[in-house]
Design a protein with these regions (language model features):
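Arg/Lys-rich, alpha-helical DNA-contact motif
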Residues: 1-29, 43-102
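Key DNA-contact positions within bacterial/archaeal DNA-binding proteins
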Residues: 36
């Protein structure tokens, strides 16, 4: 007798989440930042967004924002945080499904 659970296969959640788009409010909540911070970082760090009437961020962009927030929490200036996040992302480059092209 076959156990029905043997029919299941691993689920690649990262691929599915990569296709989800987040609103400004959702990104702020996830990253623990204000809309003003997100607006500034989006422009200064050239974080790509989608959406005509409302900015939307993919999981890759949210990761970028969270790295900047982490650096700010460590006491980095905004410019230093943006540079540190970019350097970290360059060192840890991986395939990011569904990422918005910059």
């Amino acid at each position: 007798m076959v156990d029905k659970s043997d029919l299941l296969r691993p689920v690649d959640v990262a691929t599915r989440i990569g296709a989800v788009l987040f609103t400004v409010g959702q990104v702020c909540t996830i990253a623990g930042i204000t809309k003003m911070q997100l607006d500034l970082w989006t422009v200064r760090a050239a974080i790509p967004t989608l959406g005509a009437k409302q900015r939307l961020y993919d999981a890759d962009a949210v990761e970028h924002v969270m790295l900047i927030a982490q650096a700010r929490d460590l006491g980095f200036s905004v410019d230093a945080a943006i540079e540190a996040a970019a350097a970290f992302r360059a060192r840890t480059t991986r395939v990011r499904p569904g990422a918005i092209a910059a």
